[in-house]
Design a protein with these regions (language model features):
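Conserved catalytic-site loops of classical short-chain dehydrogenases/reductases
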Residues: 7, 81-82
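The beta1-alpha1 cofactor-binding region of Rossmann-like NAD(H)/NADP(H)-dependent oxidoreductases
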Residues: 38, 59-69
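Short, conserved SAM-binding/catalytic segment
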Residues: 43-51
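Conserved glycine-rich Rossmann-like NAD(P)H-binding loop of the short-chain dehydrogenase/reductase
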Residues: 26-43
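Canonical Rossmann dinucleotide-binding motif of NAD(H)/NADP(H)-dependent dehydrogenases/reductases
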Residues: 2-31
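Hydrophobic/aromatic anchor residues within beta-strands of the central parallel beta-sheet
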Residues: 54-56
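Conserved NAD(P)H cofactor-binding loop of Rossmann-fold oxidoreductase domains
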Residues: 86-87
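Glycine-rich phosphate-binding loop signature in dinucleotide/nucleotide-binding domains
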Residues: 73-79
Length: 87
């Protein structure tokens, strides 16, 4: 049985968001959402290479449906315990 873990949602895949995630994301699954999937993938790759457990998700903060999809994706991994909106 897979244990669920705390989940951090990070919106805005930039340097400020990544710095906050590096400081606050230890022990959490980090879901990185950005309007450009390439940006989310870049941050996820950097974070994963640094030992974090990170997945990228394409999302648009101006779209309610997109936000709900991001939340649903994050909930697959556990309880959302932190939201960092760095977009």
């Amino acid at each position: 049985m897979k244990m669920k873990q705390d989940v951090m949602i990070l919106t805005g895949a930039g340097q400020i968001g990544m710095a906050i995630a590096r400081r606050m994301g230890y022990g959490k699954k980090i879901v990185v959402g950005d309007k450009k999937m390439e940006n989310a993938e870049d941050i996820a790759r950097i974070m994963n290479n640094a030992g974090f457990d990170t997945i990228p998700v394409e999302m648009d903060l101006s779209s309610r449906e997109s936000i709900l999809r991001l939340i649903a994706e994050a909930r697959k991994y556990g309880e959302i315990s932190m939201l960092v909106n760095a977009a």
